[in-house]
Amino acid sequence: MRKETSKMKIEVLFPEVANLYGDLSNIEYLKKCLNNDVEIIETSLNDEPAFVKQDDINLIFMAGMTEKSQEIVIKKLKPYADRIDELVSKNQPVLLLGNAMEILGKFIENEDESQIRAVGLYHFYAHRDMFGLFGYTNGARINKVYVRIWWTFAQITQTLNFNNIGTVIG
């Protein structure tokens, strides 16, 4: 008798704007690695994120985006800040690539020192600079975020039965 397995469920947030470096191809690759035994939920900017009401999502994924798109996504996610914090506190795997992580900080500072208020979950801010990047921390919780990202990579590779020989966060 074959044991029934449930599909892995991945929510991809805002694929219409969060695909700056073609990162959605990684989701397609993952789907093939899992022999299509995965359910992909693509949440557009016009939709309520599935993570708001569903507790069975295995991974929340968002890729990098343009600076203008960051501002749109911040407005979209701010109403769900408490829910995001709740899920992260419960060790919900969340994979944010590129500048998507900046959205969860306190603010994003432009080159002219003007600030864009971000979702505000973590005590760090990002600084936009044409010729360099980046993140500055003014609180200890940023370390917890990075540790959680590393843990998430390890958990994903173990869950998928991949041999994790090293993880690079760029």
Where are the predicted features?
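Cysteine-nucleophile active-site neighborhood
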Residues: 67-145
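Residue-level signal for functionally critical sites in structured catalytic/ligand-binding pockets
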Residues: 15-16, 22-26, 42, 66-67, ...
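N-terminal beta1-alpha1 cap of cysteine-dependent amidohydrolase-like domains
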Residues: 1-86
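Short, charged/polar low-complexity linear motifs in solvent-exposed/disordered segments
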Residues: 37-39, 114, 164-165
